[in-house]
A protein has these predicted regions:
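Charged, solvent-exposed interaction patches on well-folded alpha/beta domains
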Residues: 2-163
Length: 163
C-alpha cells in the first residue's frame, strides 16, 4: 500500500501502520506545486524538487509563476527562491525562460524582457530592483534590460518609442 501511494505524483512520502486487530493508520506527505512548467507546449505543475505533478485542476494554481525551457524544472527552485526576495519584481513577472540550460530571461509586465546572468542572480535582481525604483522602468517605454554583464545595465527602448 505504501509503495502504491508513493507512486502517485502528488504524494511525496507515505507511511502505513497496522494496529491490530482491525485498524490501519495512513500518513501522507503531499507535494506542493511552486510553479507551472511549460514543456512541449503542455503545462505541468512542478514541485520544489523539480518533480512534475499530474496537472488535474491546473487552473486552481494560476497564481504560480510560469517557467519554460529545457532544464528549467531542475533550476526553478533556486531561481524562484531568489525571485521571492524581490516582491516588486516577482509581482511583475509574466513568465521566465531558462536559456541554454544555464541562465534565465524574465518577461515582466508591459512586455519587458530582462536578461539575467548565469551567475550572481541575486546581485542582478538587486540591481533590477533598485533601478526599477529609481527610473520607473516597469512603467516606461523599455523593451529590454540586459543584466548579463554585472557591471553594466544595458537598456533597449521600444522601436516605436524611439521616434
Amino acid at each position: 500500500m505504501k509503495n502504491r501511494l508513493e507512486q502517485l505524483s502528488w504524494i511525496k512520502s507515505a507511511s502505513v501502520q497496522r494496529k491490530l486487530p482491525n485498524k490501519f493508520y495512513v500518513r501522507v506527505s503531499e507535494r506542493v506545486p511552486i510553479a507551472i512548467y511549460q514543456s512541449n507546449y503542455k503545462l505541468h505543475l512542478l514541485d520544489i524538487d523539480g518533480k512534475i505533478l499530474e496537472n488535474d485542476g491546473i487552473g486552481n494554481f494560476d497564481n504560480l509563476p510560469i517557467i519554460v525551457g529545457k532544464g528549467a524544472e531542475k533550476s526553478a527552485r533556486h531561481f524562484l527562491y531568489v525571485l521571492g526576495k524581490f516582491p516588486k519584481i516577482q509581482n511583475q513577472l509574466v513568465f521566465a525562460v531558462f536559456v541554454g540550460e544555464r541562465r534565465w530571461n524574465m518577461r515582466i509586465n508591459r512586455g519587458i524582457t530582462v536578461k539575467l546572468p548565469e551567475k550572481n542572480l541575486g546581485y542582478a535582481m538587486q540591481i533590477l530592483d533598485e533601478i526599477a525604483d529609481e527610473n520607473g522602468f516597469f512603467h516606461s517605454d523599455i523593451q529590454e534590460i540586459d543584466l548579463r554583464i554585472l557591471d553594466r545595465v544595458i537598456v533597449k527602448k521600444r522601436v516605436d518609442a524611439q521616434r
